Regions:
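Active-site-proximal loop/helix segment associated with metal-binding centers of metalloenzymes
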Residues: 34-45, 49, 127-168, 173, ...
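Bacterial Sec-exported substrate-binding components of ABC uptake systems
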Residues: 1-18
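Divalent metal-coordination and catalytic microenvironments
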Residues: 22, 32, 73, 81, ...
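Active-site environment of divalent metal-dependent phosphoester hydrolases
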Residues: 18, 37-38, 74-80, 100-103, ...
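Metallo-beta-lactamase
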Residues: 2-7, 92-164, 251-273
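Pre-active-site segment of Zn-dependent metallo-hydrolases
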Residues: 2-3, 27-71, 80-86, 137-139, ...
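Cap/insert and terminal regions of metallo-dependent hydrolase folds
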Residues: 94, 98, 174-266
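Structural motif
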Residues: 27-29, 67-68, 92, 127, ...
Length: 273
């Protein structure tokens, strides 16, 4: 467990791809639920198929009770598969505005614009979830999320300002300069990054388009938001991911952030804060 000013015990379990179970203070969140078995394929458009080559650590039935879902976008199967859609039923879900419309009539789904904040009362605690911008594919919306609650505590930085401790889930995005502004409002105790340098051929053809961060971009964003620790996700076992753990470790070492990285073993709960 890494030292931190974070005041609540936080355990993270990596289920696979961008799916993580966050257990904090008796409340359980899940990110981008993907639960399909190994070698499942999803046609995207003529000539383009996404295939996973790993077995998620959990099935829908073996998940712990989930209090809320942080869904970066609903229109890509590697972030929300059919089992993940079933999980949304009857639960609190934070996602994009467009995604909330497409997931209707689920009453628990809330769509947020970038930098918009929604209150979330769970277990007697008032959480606040702030959406962050993403740049993923040219069409479609995607959000990251910052989660705070008074029980997380605060951190006073070198400028003398006390800011709320927070958990940041990046969603699917490449590096965006705009994201650095979260440092003005929050102290990011833990950042979970969807990385892997995912790349796809655009609908009109041409060179592969980078749609998630590579290691160097992730290291840059990590430094700019002033986060304490980084959990890498979304870099294994899909054909459109182009940078695996070896490449990421090399990039993080070169960028001087490797000592702040927490690698998770699939399916193994880890107390990170």
């Amino acid at each position: 467990m890494a030292p931190s000013t974070f005041k609540s015990p936080l355990t993270v379990t990596h289920v696979g791809t961008a799916t993580a179970i966050l257990e904090v203070g008796g409340v359980t969140f899940i990110t981008d639920p993907y639960l399909s078995p190994a070698e499942t394929s999803f046609p995207v458009r003529p000539g383009v198929v996404l295939t996973s080559h790993y077995q998620p650590s959990h099935t829908l039935e073996s998940l712990p009770p989930i209090d809320a879902v942080l869904l970066s976008h609903e229109d890509h199967a590697d972030n929300l598969d059919p089992s993940g859609r079933r999980l949304l039923d009857g639960r609190r879900v934070l996602t994009t505005v467009d995604g909330a419309q497409k997931l209707a009539p689920r009453s628990g789904v809330v769509g947020l614009k970038p930098w918009e904040t929604a209150p979330l009362v769970i277990g007697g605690s008032l959480f606040e979830v702030t959406a962050t911008p993403c740049q993923h594919l040219p069409s479609g919306e995607c959000n990251g999320f910052i989660v705070t609650v008074p029980e997380f505590g605060t951190t006073t930085s070198d400028d003398g300002v006390s800011r709320p401790n927070a958990i940041y889930f990046s969603g699917d995005t490449v590096y965006l300069e705009e994201l650095a502004q979260m440092r003005e409002r929050f102290h990011i105790s833990l950042a979970l990054f969807n990385i892997g340098a995912a790349a796809v051929i655009p609908p009109g053809g041409g060179k592969p388009l980078l749609i998630t961060m590579d290691g160097r971009q992730a290291a840059r964003l990590f430094r700019e938001i002033g986060a304490d620790f980084l959990v890498p996700m979304h870099f294994e076992s899909w054909d459109h991911f182009t940078e695996g753990r070896d490449g990421l470790e090399a990039a993080f070492k070169s960028e001087g952030v490797l000592d702040k990285v927490i690698w998770l073993e699939l399916g193994v709960p880890r107390r990170v804060l």
